[in-house]
Structures are given as structure tokens and as C-alpha cells.
């Protein structure tokens, strides 16, 4: 998408994590696929897991076993998945092309940045500590930092509180409709990352974000840079 305007008075950029800054689908998929292999089932290709990576354990178990959270086996499978994933958090996880350069530009412009994710702190903290990309992040809010996860605005409002900024001066970027819903409810300008897990198969324009980007670096078109 080509920029026709810039967001004014933005002092911080907040991002969703999986599918927006990093591609964790290979590790999420591998953690779920190990469960199949351990049971003598055929391995599934990453392409089967990738579209559901944004849904975490729920999505991975749905692909691997066709089960929903209502199934009596789901909780046990979820804990097994978590254990597998914990052992390989960053084995094959990487930042999307252009993300490192985007963050460097944001920092260089004197803006603050951070992460607001539905991923629990059990995984968010060791993952972000293991990846140099996050060394300059001012705030990291996990899915269990506040009593409510996205699409509730509470996590985004908590990030703004920690940054000591009003929400209106914080932009939120995410690759799922719940990100846009949460950002709008928090009073933040929103940007849909159409390059994420859902962007190819979903009409991101229907989310009614303030802007849409098809690559990380295009976000700079919407920021007032020095």
C-alpha cells in the first residue's frame, strides 16, 4: 500500500509479535508435529500449520489432531504442546525480512517501541531475551500481563501506561483482526500487517485499520521521520 498521509504526533510504535515482527510458525508447527510423530502419525508440512500459527496452541492442535478446546483431551495436548514448544522457542524462529531495519529506523528517529502479544510471558520473555532484535524495546506486554488479552484493549493500555504516554500517541501494528479491534478500542492509530499469517487468505481491508502494509518497511511511509 502506498502512503498518502502520515500519522501525526506518534511517539511510540507497538507491535504484535508472532506474524508481525517474527515468523515463529516453523517452531510452533514443529512442536505440534512432534506430537503426531510421537504417536506414530505421519508428519504434516509446515504449510498446513502456518495459517493457524497466530492462534497458538489452539490453532496448532486443531491442525495436528482436528480437536477444539472443548474436547476432553485438549488440555493434556495443550500442555504437551507447550512443553515441546518451550524446548525450541527460537530454533527456527526469525524476524521477517525488513523488520530489523524498520526497528533501527524507529529507534534512530527517537521513537520508542514495544511489543503487545497474546503469547504468555512463559514464552514471550525467554524468546525476546534470546533475540537481539528486542534489546531496544521499551516495553513488552504478554497475554497474561493483564487480566484480559486482545481483542480487549487492556494490554495496549498497559503498554501506554508503562511508556507514560497517552494511547493516542502510540501506534499499534498487528496481523490479526483482534489486533486492530484492540488498538481501536484503546484509542490508538492502527496498522494491519497484511504480510502476516492471515494476510494472504483474509481481506485485511475489512478490519478497518487506519492503514495497511504489505511489508514491514512500508510502515515508515506512515511515520513522520526526521
Set out the residue ranges of the language-model regions.
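Asp-based, Mg2+/Mn2+-dependent phosphohydrolase catalytic module
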Residues: 1-12, 47, 107, 120-121, ...
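Active-site neighborhood of HAD-like aspartate-dependent phosphohydrolases
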Residues: 2-51
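Substrate-recognition element of Asp-dependent hydrolases with the DxDx(T/V) motif
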Residues: 20, 32, 99-129
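Hydrophobic/aromatic residues within well-ordered alpha-helical segments
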Residues: 28, 53-57, 77-85, 120
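Helix-loop "lid/cap" segments that line or gate small-molecule binding pockets
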Residues: 35-36, 56-70, 127, 159-160
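Short helix-capping segments at alpha-helix termini
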Residues: 37-42, 68-70, 109, 132-136, ...
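Residue-level detector of anion-binding/catalytic polar loops
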Residues: 42, 112, 189
Amino acid at each position: 500500500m502506498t502512503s498518502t498521509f502520515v500519522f501525526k504526533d506518534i511517539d511510540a510504535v507497538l507491535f504484535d509479535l508472532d506474524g508481525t515482527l517474527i515468523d515463529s510458525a516453523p517452531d510452533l508447527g514443529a512442536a505440534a508435529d512432534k506430537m503426531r510423530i510421537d504417536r506414530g502419525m505421519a508428519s504434516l508440512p509446515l504449510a498446513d500449520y502456518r495459517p493457524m500459527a497466530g492462534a497458538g496452541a489452539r490453532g496448532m492442535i486443531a491442525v495436528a489432531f482436528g480437536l477444539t478446546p472443548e474436547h476432553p483431551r485438549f488440555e493434556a495436548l495443550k500442555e504437551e504442546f507447550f512443553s515441546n514448544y518451550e524446548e525450541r522457542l527460537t530454533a527456527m524462529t526469525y524476524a521477517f525480512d525488513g523488520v530489523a531495519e524498520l526497528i533501527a529506523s524507529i529507534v534512530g528517529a527517537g521513537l520508542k517501541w514495544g511489543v503487545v502479544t497474546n503469547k504468555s510471558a512463559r514464552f514471550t520473555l525467554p524468546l525476546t531475551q534470546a533475540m537481539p532484535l528486542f534489546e531496544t524495546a521499551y516495553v513488552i506486554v504478554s497475554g497474561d500481563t493483564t487480566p484480559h488479552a486482545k481483542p480487549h484493549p487492556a494490554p495496549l493500555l498497559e503498554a501506554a501506561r508503562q511508556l507514560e504516554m497517552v494511547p493516542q500517541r502510540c501506534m499499534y501494528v498487528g496481523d490479526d483482526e483482534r489486533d486492530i479491534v484492540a488498538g481501536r478500542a484503546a484509542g490508538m492509530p492502527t496498522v494491519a500487517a497484511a504480510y502476516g499469517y492471515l494476510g494472504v487468505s483474509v481481506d485485511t481491508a475489512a478490519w478497518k485499520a487506519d492503514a495497511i502494509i504489505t511489508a514491514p518497511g512500508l510502515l515508515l511511509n506512515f511515520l513522520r521521520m526526521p
